């Protein structure tokens, strides 16, 4: 089994720039209504909010539901094996003023920092295997 996260975004160009230029993702496929981004074993799909229905009966994503906090209750965790690479990425993010929480050693023994993407999705960038 693999995991691919799909995020609905307001501005595809802004989001692609964020994930590609800041976080180092490679654009695998790009179309008007979908972009596939890869970095290592991580696959992110970006789709425009505009392709969702405004409202719908039953469960499912709609533009109406996304008007609240994007990704509420979800933390997207990206792991780097190299602590120096984590520090360099943190400094780059800090220069661009996108940090939510600074790089620090956490009580569970791993370094990480937190940020939000242009659409408000919450990301934690960590060193090592957070699941171990």
Which stretches of residues belong to each language-model region?
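Short alpha-helical
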Residues: 13-14, 84
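Vicinal oxygen chelate
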Residues: 1-4, 26-116, 127-132
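Conserved active-site tyrosine of GNAT-family acetyltransferases
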Residues: 15-20, 93, 117-120
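Conserved beta-strand-loop-alpha-helix junction that forms the acyl-donor binding cleft
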Residues: 8-12, 107
